[in-house]
Curated annotation (Swiss-Prot):
Keywords: Cytoplasm, Magnesium, Metal-binding, Pantothenate biosynthesis, Transferase. Pathway: Cofactor biosynthesis; (R)-pantothenate biosynthesis; (R)-pantoate from 3-methyl-2-oxobutanoate: step 1/2. This is 3-methyl-2-oxobutanoate hydroxymethyltransferase. Its cofactor is Mg(2+). The keyword Transferase applies. SUPFAM superfamilies: Phosphoenolpyruvate/pyruvate domain (SSF51621). GO terms for molecular function: 3-methyl-2-oxobutanoate hydroxymethyltransferase activity; magnesium ion binding. 3-methyl-2-oxobutanoate binds at D43, S44, D82, K112. It comes from the Bacteria. One of its GO terms (cellular component) is cytoplasm. NCBIfam families: panB, PRK00311.1. Belongs to the PanB family.
Length: 279
């Protein structure tokens, strides 16, 4: 399993870090077998797996449940788990308790928190308590209502300057990596140059230290539209739809099951079942 030290070395040697989301056992198993460097159990599971309109309804229990499944599927991969909405805002005591639960109960290697400002103190407290933290700046889905929707962040000089300063604050507070979402490539590149910790982009251009995408977006599974920054590497949804249609047709036409899918009794046992009389 790669560690924080490995990711820092990858940054220094200019080797891109590959991160991918996973939410269950089979997806995690495939991700690990493929050789991803890091798995993110994102609160995006609320929209991708649970069918919510946003990440807001996702709970700590949800994150623990799904991370446990991912850990079973990927026992040798570094796993980062999202701290869900309001799980680290009400009080420092509650934030620490929730982080403790995720680390102890789920098998995660680190937690991820969104934003800077007051969140910097959370990063500092988690780090002091021995909880590795990945920071997340730019488009932060838990704050999408405040941000005015799913929009690119840091497009003007003032907001870009704040992004750069916030990134530095996150690093100073102890973050081991930084996710940059939906920010101009120039700003992401500048942040990457100024930080010693790895940056992982999602819609942040090609001059960051790594990339992360949502599993279902990459595979074209269960999603009708994907963001501009996504490259679809397959269309699993079409394959699944075709397979299910064939299954339904075979059952309706009594073409499934075939002989190769059935179990049979020996003739004498079948006869003995009814006392030597055939039915």
């Amino acid at each position: 399993m790669k560690t924080k030290t490995d990711f820092f070395k990858m940054k220094q040697e200019n080797e891109p870090i590959v991160m991918l989301t996973a939410y269950d056992f089979p997806s995690a198993k495939l991700a690990e077998a493929a050789g991803v460097d890091m798995i993110l159990v994102g609160d995006s599971l609320g929209m991708v797996v649970l069918g919510y309109d946003s990440t807001i309804p996702v709970t700590v229990e949800d994150m623990i449940h799904h991370t446990k499944a991912v850990r079973r599927g990927a026992p040798n991969t570094f796993i980062v788990t999202d701290m869900p909405f309001m799980s680290y805002h009400l009080s420092m005591e509650e934030a620490l308790r929730n982080a403790q639960r995720i680390m102890q109960e789920s098998g995660a290697n680190a937690v991820k928190v969104e934003g800077a400002d007051d969140v910097v103190n959370v990063i500092r407290a988690f780090t002091k308590a021995g909880v590795p933290v990945v920071a997340h700046l730019g488009l932060t889905p838990q704050s999408v209502g405040v941000l005015g929707g799913y929009k690119v962040q840091g497009k003007d000089a003032e907001s870009a300057r704040k992004l750069i300063e916030d990134a530095k604050l996150c690093e100073e507070a102890g973050a081991i990596a930084l996710v940059l979402e939906c920010v101009p490539k120039q700003i992401a590149a500048e942040i990457t140059k100024q930080l010693t910790i790895p940056t992982i982009g999602i819609g942040a251009g090609d001059e960051v230290d790594g990339q992360v995408l949502v599993y279902h977006d990459v595979l074209g599974y269960g999603v009708d539209r994907v963001p501009k920054f996504v490259k679809k590497y397959a269309n699993i949804q079409e394959t699944i739809s075709h397979a299910l249609a064939n299954y339904i047709a075979d059952v309706k036409l009594r073409q499934f099951p075939e002989a190769t899918h059935m179990f049979t009794m020996k003739e004498e046992e079948w006869i003995a079942l009814y006392g030597g009389k055939r039915t």
